[in-house]
Structure formats: C-alpha cells, structure tokens
C-alpha cells in the first residue's frame, strides 16, 4: 500500500472511531501518545524544553498538541494549524424518555448546530459521548466515554401516503419529527430510567452513580470509498474531522525542529465557538504565553512571537455541485479533487488576505499540491469559521482553508481522497 493510500485508510478509521467531539479528542490522544507526545494537565506548571512533544485537553472535547522547537518562539514565531472537533448532530436531552401510543418509547433530542435534518431519517443510529459519575467529592466527578457500537435507534419518516407533500420541501419540526425510536414497551414496563440503565450497562457502572451526560446520536454506518476508481469518500463528520486528521498527521510527521509547532483542535465551532473550549476563549493565547515564559521569555517576547507566527485555519469548504451550478460563484467554485481551497471574502468573514493566501499558495507549490479559491456567490450568504474568531484573540497572521465537500452538514458528506492526501502534504510542508 502506498503511503498516500495509508492516509486515506487512516482517515476512514479515524472517522469511525470518532462519532462525536469527545471520542474524536480521545482518538487524537491515542494517536499523539503512539507518536511520542506526552499528556500534560492544563493546570500543571508549564515546564518544557526544546524537543519536547506534549498535549493537553480542555473539557474532554478540545485538544492542543505542541512540538517545542530548538529556537525561541520570539525568534521564529509559532506555526499553528487550527481545526474543530464538533459536527452538527442531535444531543439527547435530560429526562429524555417519551412513551407514546402503540407502546413505542422515543428519546427527546435537541439539534446541535445546523444539520440537514432529512438526512438523519430511516437509518440505524446509536449513542456516543461522555458520562459523568460520582467521584471522591462534589468537585471531582469521574468522566467515562461511551460509544455504543450497535444500532439502537431510528428516526422514522411518516409514510408518503399520509404526507403527499413530503417530496415538495415539506417543513420539519425539530421537536416533533426528529425524535428517535428506542424501544417497544408494554404497560407494565418501567420505562423512566431506560436510557440511564442502558448507559450503566454499557459502562458497567451503577445507574445511581450517573450524575449527568453529554450524549449524541450518530450514524452507525461506517465511512467508505466510492466512485469508479474509489476516488470519493462518503462519511459523517468530514466537516471538520478530516481537517483534524490532516493536522494531527502533519504534526506527528513534522520535520521542522527549529520552530514550535501547534495543532489546536477547538470545540463548538458549529455553534459559534463561544465556550471555554471554543476559539473565542483565551485557551490558545494563554498556552502560547505560558510556553514563551517557560522557555525563559517574557510578555515582550510573547508579543514578538505571536506577531511572527502564522496560522492555517482548516475548515471544509463547499465543493461545486453539478446539479446546482447557480448556487456558486461563476469563476471561483472549487471541485472535488481539485486541491485544498483558500477561502476569500470581501467582507472579511475569513482571515485570508492576499499576503496570507500567497504564503499558502507557496506551501502548495512546495508540496506539489494543486490549490483552488473559494468565494461565495455574491447573492448567497456564506458561513464563518475559526480564523477571524482567533484573530480577535491573537495578533496573528493566517489563512482560512479547507478541502471541498458536497452535502456539508449532511449525516454523510462527500469528499475527495486526492484532496485529503494533498492537504496533508501541504500541512507537512508548513511543518517542515
């Protein structure tokens, strides 16, 4: 198998092991540990030296990996790649069991982010997330991660015979229509703790010890390749776990030993990044400051280091859809397999400008990768991403990029094998 093929198979495995943000971070931890990175606690005293490789997590759903360079950050700046661990999905609400007529037990859910709702219907779903158990005292609950590997639930459509407008853009109620079926119950069955008992059995703990949970639905169908030559990737959470995988691959294979390298994986980008583990928080800036000071610098050195730094903010872009050409800019519509996209917006929704885009194009040329421009159709509003949020926290130059995907925010998105391999090459070039 070629190394480039290994990158794709590694991505598929990574996606299957990462059904939600918490499991994605746990999978990243395992990859980093296997490549010589040591875990630190965020509240440990920062003691590092040149050549150290370490990581720490925030809220179990964000992770920051660092390779300390031989030279002072004030002289070289930091090289940073940012991505995010979360994807649109359904979260399970507290007190979630809803018994109904016909003896059907459903779970009460809440929409996280902006998923394409219709894509979640009529497919096998299961549970993943974290569970908080009683600990040694009230301030120290114990965290357990959970991933139920078997199909547990299904969100079922109403038959077309009862809804003739279903194929005509019939609107959905998130509260009524998107509740998954979990079990068949009878009158004598105690249903109120069905979910907690299920979770307790999976974790082999007592249900009474469960204090709370963050549980999400996920599609149990595995990531796969398709196309005449297996050139396409079909999977959930390509946005943005494919960029997480590329960033972590790049830092574990990095050749630059002089500059300090950082892979920053934030959470909650899909809901605005306004959490303690999101890009709006000071967590990255605080870590960089502590790094500079641990290496003998001061606040002046920190300011110089950040100003001399460069960041690649990696979040997927919209690929050109041949069925809907009118939705795209007539001259800047990236295609699957055409290479990483540089995101540009006249109203500064992205951190890219001509200078930072030129740097990324040079990295692409050095890596032997094609590149594309992504610009929104002028009559179609686009989304935002990590870049501009982070520039509100750090005085840093950077570029917003991402690989093109179709059906962004669907339960299964479509990407390109070549694009993923090329993005890894470019990120490795940045870290070389």
List PLM regions with ranges:
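N-terminal hydrophobic/helix-forming segments and targeting peptides
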Residues: 1-432
């Amino acid at each position: 198998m070629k190394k480039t093929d290994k990158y794709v198979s590694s991505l598929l495995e990574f996606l299957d092991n990462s059904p939600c943000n918490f499991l994605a971070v746990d999978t990243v931890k395992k990859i980093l540990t296997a490549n010589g990175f040591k875990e630190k606690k965020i509240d440990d005293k920062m003691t590092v030296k040149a050549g150290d490789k370490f990581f720490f997590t925030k809220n179990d759903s964000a992770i920051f990996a660092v390779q300390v360079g031989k030279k002072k950050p004030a002289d070289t700046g930091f090289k940073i790649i940012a991505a995010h661990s979360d994807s649109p999905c359904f979260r399970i609400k507290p007190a979630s069991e809803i018994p109904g007529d016909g003896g059907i037990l459903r779970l009460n859910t809440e929409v996280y982010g902006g998923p394409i709702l219709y894509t979640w219907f009529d497919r096998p779903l299961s549970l993943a997330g974290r569970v908080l158990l009683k600990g040694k005292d009230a301030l120290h609950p114990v965290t357990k991660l959970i991933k139920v590997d078997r199909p547990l639930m299904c969100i079922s459509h109403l038959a077309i015979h009862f809804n003739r407008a279903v194929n005509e853009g019939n609107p959905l109620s998130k509260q009524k229509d998107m509740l998954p079926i979990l079990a068949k119950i009878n009158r004598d069955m105690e249903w109120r703790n069905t979910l907690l008992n299920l979770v307790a059995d999976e974790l082999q703990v007592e249900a009474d010890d469960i204090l709370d949970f963050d549980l999400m639905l996920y599609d149990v169908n595995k990531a796969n390749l398709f196309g005449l030559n297996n050139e396409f990737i079909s999977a959930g959470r390509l946005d943005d776990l494919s960029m997480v995988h590329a960033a972590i691959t790049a830092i574990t294979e990095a050749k630059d030993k002089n500059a300090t390298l950082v892979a920053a994986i934030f959470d909650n980008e899909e809901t605005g990044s306004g959490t303690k583990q999101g890009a709006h928080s000071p967590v990255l800036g605080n870590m960089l400051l502590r790094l500079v000071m641990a290496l003998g610098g001061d606040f002046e050195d920190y300011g110089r280091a950040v100003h001399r730094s460069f960041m690649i903010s990696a979040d997927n872009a919209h690929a050109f859809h041949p069925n809907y050409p009118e939705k795209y800019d007539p001259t800047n519509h990236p295609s699957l397999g055409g290479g990483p996209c540089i995101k540009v917006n006249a109203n500064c929704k992205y951190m890219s400008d001509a200078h930072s885009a030129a740097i990324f194009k040079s990295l692409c040329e050095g890596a032997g990768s094609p590149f594309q421009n992504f610009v929104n159709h002028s009559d179609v509003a686009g989304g935002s991403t990590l870049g501009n949020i982070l520039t509100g926290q750090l005085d840093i130059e950077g570029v917003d990029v991402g690989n093109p995907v179709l059906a962004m925010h669907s339960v299964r998105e479509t990407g390109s094998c070549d694009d993923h391999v090329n993005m890894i090459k470019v990120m490795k070039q940045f870290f070389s």
